Structures are given as structure tokens and as C-alpha cells.
Amino acid sequence: WTMITNALNTVGKAVKNSSYKVVTRVNLIYGDGINPFPEATNARPKDVFDLQGIDFIGVDAYKDNIKHLKNEVMAYASIAGNYALVAENKGSYANSPSLILTSFALGGGYDIYDLATSNFFINNTTEPDQIDHGIYTWDLQEKEFTPPTRSLIKGLAAAYIDVAKVKPENFAAFNINDNQPKDKLEQLICTTGAQITFQTNNASLGFVLDMHNYLLIYSLNDSQFKLENGKFGETISGRYDVNGTFTKEGTATLENQTLHAKGGVLYKVNYSSQQSLTSNTIENIGNNL
């Protein structure tokens, strides 16, 4: 273990000597969260994180169970200063949108491996049902879950400034209590400042970011968000540009404090909270598993 960590540290330092800014990451592919490895109890993932040449550690989870993934992300996020990236997870998981939303809602990130798997490997393996990891087919055709995965990524990208800095207690993620989204669902989640009731009849996922004086709201499909515990004002649609400025693309109206959200549209709602609330955002991730 000492030999391995010394080697990682040396390589990391060498790379960081580059003339451009470099962030170094090590992927860990086996273990129980950040607990010591069963085969060598003196070896821990945090040993790698503590190396001067390594900036953060991620996990190659290869899990499609939301609760199991939640446990991994929370474990890696518990290391102060670490970015809890799911460094690799199969693109062939049908619930990829739910897995991605889970990771981001808990303060982590998510990489799909891979975009498409070569047909050569699919045809030349003893386990053909295990080798195709692509979010697309080998000939770059969409799989059934490719469009909702793309839609979720676009929503997170549109809100990227706040996705990067919001705390998990203020990232409300809807319809991820199970491994697959419910077709019909009414779900109430509280952030530290807002109470939100989400309704869908089309298996939509959704999220709300509570930024204290405004909310960012997004859903994959047309959905409703009832907003309570505050005064809610101007509502616009748009996205953050490359300079980090929210660019207005349209307007919307709240009806009885309810936003009838169009799928694939990011909304910004100005608000002031009535009183502090106890957040239950984390409890509403994988809670039925």
C-alpha cells in the first residue's frame, strides 16, 4: 500500500508541475465506502486523498441501486474538501437519469462510462449482456432512456452555477425514492426555506434548488410545483450563460403559488422564506429501497 500511494503521489506531483492548472483525481474501484479495504485494514481511500499530489478521489461505483449509490456518494462527500464524483457508472443502466440526479443532489458528480461500446467488444466476449456500457448503441442510436438522460443533463447544465454550490439540504430531488420513477406521484419535500409539492402523471423527475432568495426549478416532463412557506415573486425561464449570468428566455405565472412547469425548461422564482424549515431532501432519496 505504501508503494502504491508513493507512486500515486509522485505521478500526481509531476502532472501538477505543468504550466497550466491541473486537478488530479484517483478512481477507487473496490471497497466499502471510505472504510478500510477488507484485504488490508491498514489501507483506506482517504490515504489517497491525503496525498499532496492528489486533489480528490472518486469511485467507480457500477451500481444501479439508488440507495447503494447514495451511500457511496455520501461517504466520499464526508471527506472534507473532497469532490464526491461517481467517476464511472455504466451508461446502459435504464435508470441513468435517477442515478445522475441522486449524485448531484448529494453534492457529488457523475460520469457515464461509456458513450457507446464498440461492436467488436460486444461480439467478442463471453458475456455479451455485460459488455455494452453505452448510453447509445454501438452504432450511435438512442436507447429508450437516452432522451431523459440528455434532458436531465441539460437541466443541470442550465443551472450549473447553483448546482455547483448549493448544499444537499437545499437540493430537492423529486421522484427518486425508488430505482425507477413513479408514473404518478405527489411528493412533498422541504428545503431549509421552502416547502414544495411536486406532481407528475408522466414519470417525470424534477429538482428545485433553494438559493435563499430565489428557487431554480426544472422537470424532465410537464409537471406541477406548489410552492409554500414564503412570498413568491417574479418567475422567469432561462439559463446561466458562460459568464455565470442568468439569461432570461421567457416568463411564467404562478397560479395559487403553483408553477405549471414545461418539461426541459429551467425556471427562476424570486422568493423570501416565511420561516426556517427542517430539510428532508436527503431522506427523500432512495427512501423506499
Where are these regions (language model features)?
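Aromatic- and carboxylate-lined catalytic core of secreted/periplasmic carbohydrate-active enzymes
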Residues: 84, 91-232, 238-240, 244-246, ...
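C-terminal beta-strand-rich structural cap/linker in extracellular carbohydrate-active enzymes
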Residues: 252-289
